[in-house]
């Protein structure tokens, strides 16, 4: 309202470098763990609006420079894309998102090579929960019984039950109250543990912030055109990060 002359306040913008004790070294240290959005709002007087991508356009452009065709397209629907096969010299983790079950979104998993933080395999499709559970079991076995981190939403529990029935040996468990990771062998004899990862109002902003931080700091490499394209439609909507409607 002050910018529009509606009230008697005089708008003033004070950039971070106005302060005499703040130099480029201070700025670099202060912003190391801040998202571009936080930097713009808190230090550059540039307040983001709805519709802006969560990932900065410059970072999205850089991500696309790494996009390449997978070496293999596997699975019953050919939607399991593989860029690199299992290598026993490395450690892997499989992270799985489970579709809601209404047919409007996809079940997706990514396999990450932890030493280099490369996403070396990916699936995106709409299999039934039991089929998806079998796929996760096979993919996890293929990559050395890697840790399976499966989202435990309503349908996710059905997928996790399938993996338990198949006796997969390396499922992600956490403490219900704190979301703290706990080893599977310990978790199976605890009463306050839960299989899978819980995406909640508490954990979702942390997940998004960490994703943005890893991309901005060039800590993760993504080869998939599908994932890269999703960053173009992952936007801020009234302060909440979410996919654009119809995407």
Task: Give the label of every model feature segment.
Residues 7-8, 24-185, 201, 205-209, ...:
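RNase H-like, metal-dependent nuclease domains and their acidic two-metal-ion catalytic environment used
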Residues 21:
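N-terminal cationic and glycine-rich segments that engage phosphates or anionic surfaces
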Residues 196, 200:
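A charged helix-plus-loop insertion that forms the helical arch/lid used to bind
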Residues 184-187, 194:
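Intrinsically disordered, low-complexity, charge-dense segments enriched in Lys/Arg
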Residues 194-195, 214:
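Structured lumen-facing ectodomains of secretory-pathway proteins
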């Amino acid at each position: 309202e002050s910018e529009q002359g509606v009230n008697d306040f005089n708008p003033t913008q004070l950039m971070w470098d106005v302060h005499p004790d703040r130099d480029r070294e201070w700025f670099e240290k202060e912003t190391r763990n801040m998202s571009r959005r936080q930097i713009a709002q808190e230090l550059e007087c540039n307040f983001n609006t709805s519709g802006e991508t969560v990932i900065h356009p410059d970072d999205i452009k850089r991500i696309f420079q790494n996009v390449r065709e997978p070496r293999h397209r596997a699975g019953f629907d050919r939607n399991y894309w593989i860029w690199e096969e299992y290598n026993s010299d490395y450690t892997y983790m499989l992270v799985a998102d489970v579709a809601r079950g209404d047919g409007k979104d996809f079940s997706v998993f990514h396999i990450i090579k932890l030493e280099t933080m490369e996403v070396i395999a990916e699936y995106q499709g709409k299999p039934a929960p039991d089929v998806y559970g079998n796929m996760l079991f096979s993919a996890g076995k293929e990559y050395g019984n890697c840790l399976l981190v499966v989202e435990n939403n309503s349908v996710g529990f059905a997928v996790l039950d399938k993996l338990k029935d198949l006796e997969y040996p390396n499922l992600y468990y956490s403490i219900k109250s704190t979301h703290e990771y706990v080893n599977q062998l310990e978790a199976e004899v605890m009463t306050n543990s839960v299989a899978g990862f819980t995406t909640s109002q508490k954990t979702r902003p942390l997940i998004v912030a960490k994703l943005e931080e890893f991309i901005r700091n060039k800590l993760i490499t993504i080869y998939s055109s599908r994932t890269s394209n999703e960053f173009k439609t992952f936007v801020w909507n009234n302060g909440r990060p979410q996919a654009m409607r119809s995407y």
